[in-house]
Structures are given as C-alpha cells and as structure tokens.
C-alpha cells in the first residue's frame, strides 16, 4: 500500500490555499465514514511521485495525518489548467 504523510490544515480559504501552493504544498480533504471531514495539507512533490505509481487511483492508500493513520481512496483530483501541478485532492475514508 502507498503511504502519504499529511498535516492538518490551519488556515482556510483562497489566501491560505495560495500560500500553501507557493510553499510547495497543496490542500486536500478527507471525508466519509462516521468521523467529521478533516482539511489537510500535502507536499506536492511527494504526492506527484506517488501519483505515477500503478494503483494510486484504484487501491486503498494510507494517509498519515499528524501520526494517525487513515485508510482512504482518491475520490477527486483537481489539476492546474496548464502547469503539471495538483491543486486539490478529495479522499474518502474506507
């Protein structure tokens, strides 16, 4: 299984998301199950390297959010219009 390190997001909104992206990170969200949705931030380069692996979109992934492991699947991916960059990912708990 693929493991991705994540951190809980502090800021919300467009400005906070832009600051994340300029720092080489991007926002994401984990939802589903009986727990409340969690906004997280991911390192762009590490996720981009994992994305090219077979099974990233179809298999169960492990997100390590501040040390707590959560099993998720990729629900939706948003990309930059013309740059090869990820701008947001939705994960759903398994």
UniProtKB/Swiss-Prot annotation:
Entry-linked Pfam families: Ribosomal_L25p
Disulfide bond positions: none
Entry's Gene Ontology molecular function annotations: 5S rRNA binding; structural constituent of ribosome
Keyword Lipid biosynthesis among UniProt keywords: no
SUPFAM superfamilies in alphabetical order: Ribosomal protein L25-like
Keyword match Hydrolase: no
GO cellular component: cytosolic large ribosomal subunit
GO biological process, one term: translation
Sorted UniProt keywords: Ribonucleoprotein, Ribosomal protein, RNA-binding, rRNA-binding
Coiled coil location: none
PANTHER family: RIBOSOMAL PROTEIN L25/GLN-TRNA SYNTHETASE, ANTI-CODON-BINDING DOMAIN-CONTAINING PROTEIN, RIBOSOMAL PROTEIN L25_GLN-TRNA SYNTHETASE, ANTI-CODON-BINDING DOMAIN-CONTAINING PROTEIN
Oligomer status and interactors: Part of the 50S ribosomal subunit; part of the 5S rRNA/L5/L18/L25 subcomplex. Contacts the 5S rRNA. Binds to the 5S rRNA independently of L5 and L18.
Family statement drawn from the similarity comment of this UniProt entry: Belongs to the bacterial ribosomal protein bL25 family.
Function description: This is one of the proteins that binds to the 5S RNA in the ribosome where it forms part of the central protuberance.
Listed name of the protein: Large ribosomal subunit protein bL25
Lineage of producing organism: Bacteria, Pseudomonadati, Pseudomonadota, Gammaproteobacteria, Enterobacterales
Gene giving rise to this polypeptide: rplY
């Amino acid at each position: 299984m693929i493991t991705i390190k994540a951190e809980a997001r502090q800021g919300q909104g467009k400005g906070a998301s832009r600051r994340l992206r300029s720092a080489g990170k991007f926002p994401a969200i984990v939802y589903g199950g009986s727990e409340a949705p969690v906004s997280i931030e991911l390192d762009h380069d590490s996720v981009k390297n994992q994305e090219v692996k077979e099974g990233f979109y179809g298999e169960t992934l492990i997100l390590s959010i501040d040390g707590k492991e959560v099993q998720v699947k990729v629900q939706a991916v948003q990309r930059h219009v013309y740059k090869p960059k990820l701008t947001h990912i939705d994960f759903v708990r398994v």
